[in-house]
């Protein structure tokens, strides 16, 4: 792909669906078989989006750097949070619910940082697709729709996490009311 050549990043085919991602520590783009071998506008848009992340990395886009630094921490903390939540529900321990609330709040904040990263990568993808003449007129509109739909998944995930956070707060408040 021409976009790859511009960013001097290696691209590999990997197994799975919806597993496409840019790995900033290894400076490589992993694309699922359908995207890697695809010729559809959707395949081009997804591949270009991942190239957008590589460009963010190369240009030191601040939200990308923050997000990349937070990924390992959030992954570990999220695991602990759900484990703590399970213990609190089974054992009725409100201390673990409070811990889970704090951890879920950290997850929500991480998702807030992720949104501008994903939106910016999609914008960069569209610029690359246009500059390299990989899409024309209606194809450009289709690529925008694909990338907008992808962004909506991040928004939906954020809203879901916010609702989970509110649910935990309500559980904690109801347990505190029961103790009064």
Region annotations inferred by a language model:
Residues 58-68:
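Short juxtamembrane and helix-loop transition motifs at transmembrane-helix boundaries
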